């Protein structure tokens, strides 16, 4: 017997200006409560989605995000609560922007590939330069073209960095250390990556031959979809101290943002794991509310195989972003006829938006070892956390939030409050408001390109037909998302960036 919209509302309670609680009973078998963070505009979108679902209008075959947050709260071994961040929108199994942590010492606790996503370690890297907007404007088109020429982009794009099967095995195991050894990265790049750009539990043997075959030609490529490289300028500085630590000292300073993941390799790792886990669930009698939430006990062979394969795909994504950093440095050096070093093209930080990691957190006054699933959400550790780079010990971890094409992006910093409320996690971007198919129906790609040109943004796109899917209209407002996190105290704004050129798959 399905409930109507008003019945559903009985289970939802506003607990603060920016936070709602999802009470047990909203979906069956909830082990813990759910919460989601919103402001007024985002709240309206969340409730509209629920209302439509009650009328029988599903979201492209996915449950509404609120229901998905509830279903995650019903997974075995979950602790504290299932958390939806302001950019949450429905996805495969877990909503994108839903994070959850599972107790490693609970033998029932599970790992779920749907809680990481298909694009494993999809993430963002930000580079700074010592250039000013006035240096770049006259050569903006040239620079966009140079980046487009250097970085292979698009759906089936192939890498320019030479790589054979043995190289791939090593890259899967070593992450950024491989890039460093091969001369595609600077030593200090590594310091400024989450996990130092290498997940140690990676095992290339847990990545199938099919996944490797998909991954081999794609290294150092941008891919299509919401992946992009953007030349940006600093538009606003909210926290001068944090900005200085990141090497940002004035408005108009030029940066480059690279947004990419593990391409076909990560997708295949996830697909392979879901197949293996369906069988494991039958064997271990694991019941879930939604079959997209296929999972396995963390300690089971399937659970361990997935975590080792996921870590390898994560390393692949870090190598991928390192390769694109190398190509970006070359493109800039060529246009400005100098060296990347002289342009001060340093990595500010590199974060992952889709990953599961073992971390220590205090829950109900006790330190516990948890497997933290972050899907469409970003680690945001506070000042003095042992896992963040020395340079950022006093500011908290930099958190990179990519806006959508042609809108602004942000750099935030992690907070102590986020550590207690959300396991040191905050939003990751704008979050879709329209499905990809709807975006294609409602928007014309030429309009989208014209609009960017009107805003003075140089654009290079490999597949123009895919542009509508990524048009700003398809997304929630990134400023709403970032401000909600800021007001809720789970991360703080440091820098706002606006694009002047965008390169896209």
From Swiss-Prot:
Disulfide bonds: none
Predominant cellular place of this UniProt entry's protein: nucleus
Keyword Membrane: no
Residues engaged in binding GMP: 226-230, 353-354, 402-405, 409, 428-431, 504
Keywords carried by this UniProt record: Cytoplasm, GTP-binding, Isopeptide bond, Ligase, Manganese, Metal-binding, Nucleotide-binding, Nucleus, Phosphoprotein, tRNA processing, Ubl conjugation
Cofactor binding comment, as recorded: Binds 2 manganese ions per subunit.
GO terms (BP aspect): tRNA splicing, via endonucleolytic cleavage and ligation
Enzyme active site: 428 (gmp-histidine intermediate)
Entry cofactors: Mn(2+)
Enzyme kind, highest EC tier: ligase
Catalytically driven reaction(s): a 3'-end 3'-phospho-ribonucleotide-RNA + a 5'-end dephospho-ribonucleoside-RNA + GTP = a ribonucleotidyl-ribonucleotide-RNA + GMP + diphosphate; a 3'-end 2',3'-cyclophospho-ribonucleotide-RNA + a 5'-end dephospho-ribonucleoside-RNA + GTP + H2O = a ribonucleotidyl-ribonucleotide-RNA + GMP + diphosphate + H(+)
PTM annotation (Phosphoserine): residues: 300
Signal peptide (from-to): none
Cellular component aspect of the GO annotation: cytoplasm; cytosol; nucleoplasm; nucleus; tRNA-splicing ligase complex
Regions annotated as coiled coil: none
EC number in record: 6.5.1.8
Binding site for Mn(2+) 1: 119, 122, 227
Quaternary structure, from the entry: Catalytic component of the tRNA-splicing ligase complex.
Miscellaneous section: Ligation probably proceeds through 3 nucleotidyl transfer steps, with 2',3'-cyclic phosphate termini being hydrolyzed to 3'-P termini in a step that precedes 3'-P activation with GMP. In the first nucleotidyl transfer step, RTCB reacts with GTP to form a covalent RTCB-histidine-GMP intermediate with release of PPi; in the second step, the GMP moiety is transferred to the RNA 3'-P; in the third step, the 5'-OH from the opposite RNA strand attacks the activated 3'-P to form a 3',5'-phosphodiester bond and release GMP.
Function, in words: Catalytic subunit of the tRNA-splicing ligase complex that acts by directly joining spliced tRNA halves to mature-sized tRNAs by incorporating the precursor-derived splice junction phosphate into the mature tRNA as a canonical 3',5'-phosphodiester. May act as an RNA ligase with broad substrate specificity, and may function toward other RNAs.
UniProt-recorded name of the protein: RNA-splicing ligase RtcB homolog
Source organism: Papio anubis (Olive baboon)
């Amino acid at each position: 017997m399905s409930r109507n919209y008003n019945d559903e509302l009985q289970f939802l309670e506003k607990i603060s200006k920016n936070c709602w609680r999802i009470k047990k009973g909203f979906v069956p078998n909830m082990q813990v409560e759910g919460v989601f963070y919103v402001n007024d505009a985002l709240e309206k979108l969340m409730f509209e989605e629920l209302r439509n679902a009650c009328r029988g209008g599903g979201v492209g075959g996915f449950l509404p995000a609120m229901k998905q947050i509830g279903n995650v709260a019903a997974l075995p071994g979950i602790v504290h609560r299932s958390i939806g961040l302001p950019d949450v929108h429905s996805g495969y199994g877990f909503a994108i922007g839903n994070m959850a942590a599972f107790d490693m010492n609970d033998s029932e606790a599970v790992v779920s590939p749907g809680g990481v996503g298909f694009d494993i370690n999809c993430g963002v890297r930000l580079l700074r330069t010592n250039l000013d907007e006035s240096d770049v404007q006259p050569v903006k088109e040239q620079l966009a073209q140079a980046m487009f020429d250097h970085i292979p982009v698009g759906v089936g794009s192939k890498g320019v960095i030479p790589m054979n099967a043995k190289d791939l095995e090593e890259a899967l195991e070593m992450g950024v250390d491989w890039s460093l050894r091969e001369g595609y990265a600077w030593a200090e790049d590594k310091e400024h990556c989450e996990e130092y750009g290498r997940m140690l539990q990676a095992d290339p043997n847990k990545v199938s031959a099919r996944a490797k075959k998909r991954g081999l030609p794609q290294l150092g490529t941008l891919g299509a979809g919401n992946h992009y490289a953007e030349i940006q300028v600093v538009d606003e500085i909210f926290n001068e101290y944090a900005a200085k630590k990141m090497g940002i000292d004035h408005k108009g300073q030029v940066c480059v943002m690279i947004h990419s993941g593990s391409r076909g390799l990560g997708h295949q790792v996830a697909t392979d794991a879901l197949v293996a886990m369906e069988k494991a669930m039958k064997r271990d009698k694991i019941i879930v509310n939604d079959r997209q939430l296929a999972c396995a006990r963390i300690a089971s062979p399937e659970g361990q195989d997935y975590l080792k394969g996921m870590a390898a795909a994560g390393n692949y994504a870090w190598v991928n972003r390192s390769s694109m950093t190398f190509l970006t440095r070359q493109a800039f050096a060529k246009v400005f006829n100098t060296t990347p070093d002289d342009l001060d093209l340093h990595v500010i930080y590199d974060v992952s938006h889709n990953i599961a990691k073992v971390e220590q957190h205090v829950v109900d006054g006790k330190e516990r070892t948890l497997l933290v699933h972050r899907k469409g959400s970003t680690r945001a550790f506070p000042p003095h956390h042992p896992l963040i780079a020395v340079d950022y010990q006093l500011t908290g971890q930099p958190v990179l939030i990519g806006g959508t094409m042609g809108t602004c992006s942000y750099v935030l910093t992690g907070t102590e409050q986020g550590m207690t409320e959300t396991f040191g996690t905050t939003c990751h971007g704008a979050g879709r408001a329209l499905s990809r198919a709807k975006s294609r129906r409602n928007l014309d790609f030429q309009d989208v390109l014209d609009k960017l040109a009107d805003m003075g943004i140089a654009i290079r796109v490999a597949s123009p037909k895919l542009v509508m899917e990524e048009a700003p209209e398809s997304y929630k407002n990134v400023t709403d998302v970032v401000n909600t996190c800021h007001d809720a105290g789970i991360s703080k704004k440091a820098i706002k960036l606006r694009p002047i050129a965008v390169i896209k798959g």
